[in-house]
Regions:
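N-terminal intrinsically disordered, cationic/polar leader segments
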Residues: 3, 56, 71-267
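Polybasic, lysine-enriched low-complexity intrinsically disordered terminal tails
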Residues: 1-65
Length: 267
């Protein structure tokens, strides 16, 4: 009896195989191609699920949802051109740069200060300036401050994800200078130091204040400068530019937060 049952099952299996082959053979080439192009609905759903899971796994190596990305420094660069009867300036600034610089204002000491600003802030900076140096360096220094402030404002954008605030104390031999900044979209300069000499080379020391006032006004930022110590004017001015560079670099860097650092929701 067992042998007969086995034989019956074998015959039944062979019959199914033959029926399948016959069904397949009875289909036209067009029908077979159509089946290959349009698999069953269940197969489609499985494929979509796999693709979605693969994309999710590529974006996040863990199962936890990925945190929203900060926007800090995603487009942190700007190029400004400004021409007046007193100066002609083209300035390029990249805040998330590498400390590269190419500066030519026609005022050697001022170039030196701006190069230090770029290097210590790790900014890329290019300035081509032609000013009325036959008068003095006042217009050149102030107007470069105006254009630099405009470039900073453009480069920081909506300030999402940025630290916004920073304070840096810069030593340089006898000089010690504190600079605090706030990228708040409000202009304010606090710089109450009076230099003991009128010039360093061709550079007029009183223009330091005019430069930072222009930057603050055009960038929409608070700048506080405190000369804590120092006797050498060159060192004091250089420490001021470097302190400003370091403070600004911290203020524009990524805080890890989402959005702007303000209860108002915008700056």
């Amino acid at each position: 009896m067992a042998k007969k049952a086995k034989s019956k099952n074998t015959v039944s299996s062979r019959a199914k195989v033959l029926q399948t082959e016959q069904d397949s053979a009875g289909k036209s080439k067009e029908e077979k191609l159509e089946e290959e192009k349009n698999p069953t609905d269940n197969k489609k759903d499985d494929t979509l699920t796999i693709k979605e899971e693969t994309m999710e796994n590529n974006n996040s190596k863990t199962k936890a949802p990925a945190a929203p990305e900060s926007n800090a420094n995603k487009s942190a660069e700007s190029v400004i051109t400004r021409k007046t009867k007193e100066t002609s300036i083209t300035l390029g600034l990249r805040l998330n740069g590498a400390g590269n610089y190419d500066v030519n204002t026609g005022v050697g000491f001022f170039d030196h200060m701006l190069e230090g600003f770029a290097k210590h802030g790790n900014f890329d900076l290019k300035i081509i300036c032609k000013g009325d140096l036959n008068v003095d360096c006042h217009h050149t220094v102030e107007d470069v401050g105006i254009v630099l402030g405009q470039a900073i404002k453009n480069a920081v954008g909506n300030k999402e994800g940025m630290n916004r605030y920073a304070t840096f104390i810069q030593p340089m031999d006898d000089a010690l200078v504190l600079v605090s900044v706030d990228l708040c979209n409000r202009t304010y300069l606090n710089f109450d130091y009076d230099f003991k000499v009128e010039r360093v080379g061709y550079f007029e020391t009183e223009t330091v204040k005019e430069f930072f006032r222009a930057v603050a006004d055009e960038a929409g930022m608070n700048i506080h400068i405190k000369v804590l110590d120092g006797t050498n004017t060159h060192h004091i001015i250089e420490a001021t530019f470097k302190a400003f560079a370091n403070a600004l670099a911290i203020a524009v860097s990524d805080s890890g937060r989402v959005g702007v650092l303000s209860t108002k929701g915008a700056l």
